């Protein structure tokens, strides 16, 4: 019996071989990774987080540049920290700006870093900031982080008023630029 009480999963040699082939051929993307920097996760068995991701077969991870009530300065600081990581270990990482970059990360056995926001508060009412952050590599964004902001209601708001005028404008701009609208919460 396993620790979770559900029993042990046993595969036949054929099933094991098939699952390894499928895993190796698939694109593996973590839609919301833990922190890669600020702080960097501690080594496990002497291996850095990036190395563990590569060994596990990940091809890309979505790293958060802004969450909760983060502002413009917070988001820029996180972008700077992740650019430093990309510069420090270019043999292990690549900034993801397109689908082709994800395929390249897989082909080169690197971890693709996808910049994401869990709130659009760093954008504020400045529509031009979408273009600026897109040029910095932003490719995925939740408009709200659970609570209401100028873009709309988050999942914790009982009224559920949906998107505001700014929110609708943001979705149009994100669609124009190719930034994924994340609906997680």
Question: Predicted regions: what is each one?
Answer:
Residues 153-172, 176-180:
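Glycine-rich tight-turn/loop motif centered on a GG-T
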């Amino acid at each position: 019996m396993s620790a979770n009480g559900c029993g042990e999963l046993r595969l036949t040699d054929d099933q094991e071989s098939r699952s390894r082939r499928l895993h190796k051929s698939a694109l593996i993307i973590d839609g919301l990774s833990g922190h890669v920097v600020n702080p960097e996760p501690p080594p496990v068995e002497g291996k850095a987080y990036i190395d563990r991701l590569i060994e596990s077969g990940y091809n890309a991870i979505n790293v958060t540049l802004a969450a909760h009530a983060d502002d413009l300065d917070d988001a820029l600081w996180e972008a700077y920290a992740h650019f430093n990581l990309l510069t420090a270990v270019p043999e292990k990482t690549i900034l993801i700006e397109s689908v082709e970059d994800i395929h390249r990360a897989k082909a080169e056995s690197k971890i693709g870093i996808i910049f994401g926001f869990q709130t659009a508060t760093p954008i504020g009412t400045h529509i031009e900031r979408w273009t600026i952050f897109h040029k910095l590599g932003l490719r995925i964004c939740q408009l709200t982080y659970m609570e209401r902001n100028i873009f709309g209601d988050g999942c914790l708001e009982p009224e559920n008023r949906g998107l505001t005028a700014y929110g609708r404008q943001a979705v149009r701009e994100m669609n124009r630029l190719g930034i994924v609208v994340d609906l997680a919460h």
